[in-house]
């Protein structure tokens, strides 16, 4: 990494580790006077890697410079902003700063981890200031689908940066305060915002006249029109506003609210502690579902992205012991599809359709409302804040490019697309000179059970290969002179039926023996000199010969090669 930190010690630098060029994985770094600040540490979701649903950002840069980091600041509780903390914090051990609701949620979420007692989670009052030298931070309330979403105003002697987090302007939120436009306007009038770093996820939606209260009205109508069977609503688990909306809609239809999914229980517990839940709303435990008829229940379940460990997936696959889905039941997807999850979600749709249930989503009904701004709201934000520099983040390339174009149309002097790994120098004297000055290579990590694997790991590559083409195993027993003792042991998993396909086990054995013996002849050839002067070199050569032969056979017969596991065992 060719970055001289001393050279830029007095400069404001911005470095996104995740979320710029993709949806999710939000993790952004800010630098001034030799110190660094982390804003958010989220996960991303994937269906591309067998056995892996979640990926976390590459934090090698943080670890290499850990002595210069002052802490982690959290904007809000959504998984794409906090989900990586549980996997990465133990490597960093930095203090975490967040508002009361976010702090309580983090403590509850992380309580089951061994390092929970070590964690320092510090509560910050919203609309108040926090000093983490050399930074002075101000948490500014913005509306989102969860309460206490805070934009972070990062103040330095060289200029101030407004990191927006996820936001929208909503006049009648179901929960939480409205956006603090008064403070935003004040900042704009005073010319106090040098740069604004803002999300881009909803940039293509031009406008929206509806709010969560309007959604509540329509959900009441939808629920009342499906009277006979069970109603299951699946949402993003951390969307506490939607939990309240659905609970109120269920109550108006005379239904009790059931919950399936640990993460939902967690958010409800914290919301209850904060007195966010409306009076008269009671939640039915899973073990008590049998006490009610289906038409008396509305169940809120995890699984809106097709996750195979979720409550809805278990329902769809008859793995939920307390209640079953049947014809006449209704499933409502009160959520949007995160790019990349289409395959998993459509697979879930198909599984549910096998049960003849009715599926309702935002394509056929008004059952979801985004927590993100529309383009008109972004334009309003720029009129309020009037930044001299805009860095578009949190979105795929098309979102960032469109955000940059809109910001430019709004008269922002310098607009930049964020890109993971880019180190951007924010120039306070000449904002138009703000630019990328360097780049670090990043490799996200897959959350594989209890361990983290770099996405470029050979293990990930092998797993993909096995998933695509299966595995073909060959065990060869030899004596100390490498003479084969017995027929090779062969096993084919996920690619070939050795009993019924045209290439029989015996044929494979013959081909392997031929390749092996031909390899021995080449090894014994005097012309090869000292190329095979030790057993390791001999074994490596023989393995390559067998691999080459098997690869040719499979390519001719199947059109593709499986993952080969070939072992030579000396007896």
Model-derived segments and spans:
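C-terminal tails and terminal domains of large nucleic-acid-associated
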Residues: 535, 539-571
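Short glycine-rich phosphate-binding loop at a beta-alpha junction
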Residues: 95, 391, 565-568
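Conserved hydrophobic residues forming the short capping helix/wall of the S-adenosyl-L-methionine
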Residues: 110, 407, 554
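His/Asp/Glu-rich metal-coordinating catalytic cores
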Residues: 2-73, 78-291, 310-324, 343-345
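Hard-cation-handling environments
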Residues: 204-334, 338-363, 367-532, 543
């Amino acid at each position: 990494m060719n970055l001289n930190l001393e050279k830029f010690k007095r400069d404001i630098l911005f470095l996104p580790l995740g979320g710029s060029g993709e949806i999710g994985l939000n993790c952004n770094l800010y630098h001034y006077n030799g110190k660094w600040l982390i804003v958010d540490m989220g996960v991303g979701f994937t269906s591309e890697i067998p056995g892996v649903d979640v990926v976390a950002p590459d934090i090698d840069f943080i670890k290499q410079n850990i002595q210069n980091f002052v802490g982690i600041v959290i904007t809000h509780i959504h998984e794409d902003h906090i989900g990586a903390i549980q996997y990465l914090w133990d490597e960093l051990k930095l203090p975490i700063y967040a508002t009361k609701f976010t702090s309580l949620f983090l403590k509850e979420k992380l309580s089951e981890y061994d390092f929970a007692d070590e964690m320092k989670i510090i509560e910050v009052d919203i609309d108040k200031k926090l000093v983490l030298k050399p930074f002075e931070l101000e948490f500014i309330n913005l509306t989102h689908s969860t309460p206490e979403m805070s934009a972070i105003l990062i103040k330095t002697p060289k200029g101030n940066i407004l990191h927006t987090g996820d936001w929208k302007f909503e006049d009648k939120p179901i929960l939480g305060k409205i956006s603090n436009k008064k403070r935003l306007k004040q900042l704009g009038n005073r010319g106090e915002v040098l740069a604004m770093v803002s999300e881009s996820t909803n940039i293509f939606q031009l406008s929206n006249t509806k709010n969560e209260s309007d959604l509540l009205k329509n959900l009441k109508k939808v629920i009342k029109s499906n009277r006979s069977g069970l109603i299951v609503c699946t949402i993003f688990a951390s969307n506490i506003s939607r939990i309240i909306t659905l609970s109120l809609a269920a109550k108006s239809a005379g239904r009790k609210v059931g919950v399936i999914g640990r993460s939902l229980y967690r958010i409800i517990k914290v919301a209850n502690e904060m007195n966010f839940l409306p009076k008269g709303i009671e939640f039915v435990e899973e073990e008590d579902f049998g006490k009610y008829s289906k038409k008396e229940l509305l169940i809120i379940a995890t699984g809106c992205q097709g996750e195979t460990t979720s409550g809805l997936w278990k329902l769809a696959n008859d793995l939920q012991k307390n209640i079953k889905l049947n014809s006449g039941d209704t499933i409502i997807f009160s959520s949007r599809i995160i790019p990349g999850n289409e395959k998993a979600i459509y697979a879930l749709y198909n599984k549910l359709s096998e049960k003849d249930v009715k599926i309702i989503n935002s394509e056929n009904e008004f059952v979801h409302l985004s927590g993100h701004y529309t383009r008109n709201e972004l334009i309003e934000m720029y009129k309020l804040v009037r930044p001299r520099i805009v860095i578009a983040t949190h979105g795929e390339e098309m979102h960032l490019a469109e955000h940059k174009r809109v910001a430019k149309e709004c008269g922002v002097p310098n607009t930049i697309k964020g890109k993971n790994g880019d180190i951007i120098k924010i120039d306070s004297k000449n904002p138009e000179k703000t630019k990328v000055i360097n780049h670090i290579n990043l490799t996200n990590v897959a959350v594989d059970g209890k361990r983290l694997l770099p996405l470029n790991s050979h293990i990930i590559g092998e797993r993909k290969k096995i998933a695509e083409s299966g595995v073909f195993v060959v065990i060869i027993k030899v004596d100390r002179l490498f003479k084969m003792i017995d027929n090779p042991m062969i096993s084919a998993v996920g690619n070939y039926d050795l009993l019924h396909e045209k290439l029989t086990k015996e044929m494979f054995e013959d081909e392997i023996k031929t390749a092996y013996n031909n390899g021995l002849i080449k090894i014994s050839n005097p012309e090869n000199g000292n190329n095979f002067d030790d057993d390791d070199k001999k074994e490596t050569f023989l393995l390559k010969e067998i691999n080459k032969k098997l690869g040719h056979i499979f390519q001719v017969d199947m059109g593709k090669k499986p993952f080969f596991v070939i072992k030579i065992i000396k007896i």
